[in-house]
């Protein structure tokens, strides 16, 4: 799944990933010093990895699951209809105001159930504002909007909860960390 996170979040995740790799290398060296062969140490590291050094996407997924469990997002949502699923498959970003955030694109292979939960939550939280944006014809590429139309579009866009916004909130409210 492709998401847009802040450049600060992207930098933090890059540092976390670097720390994870360094800890793995240090542990491998310690295991070799303790008498294991290089291959034995590598096998031990591979077995330790899920618990001690999970993949970055697993760490981000953990933060995301916590955010989706928060009271404001955790609801018994109706499943997405085939038409809604089709609309979610269309490429492009959700409309949003130009708030000056510097964003970085990241791709994560989240579990299918988490992607479905994220997309359903995003759609259900946003459907009223999305409907109004489309009814007023305030979205679409190449639109020439008046100042008033831009103002209305930006107001409605603030009510949207696109998947990337939820991921950014997850990373802010539940900062990723390696297991202790």
Spell out what each predicted region is.
Residues 1-50, 82-150, 154-161:
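Short Lys/Arg-rich basic patches
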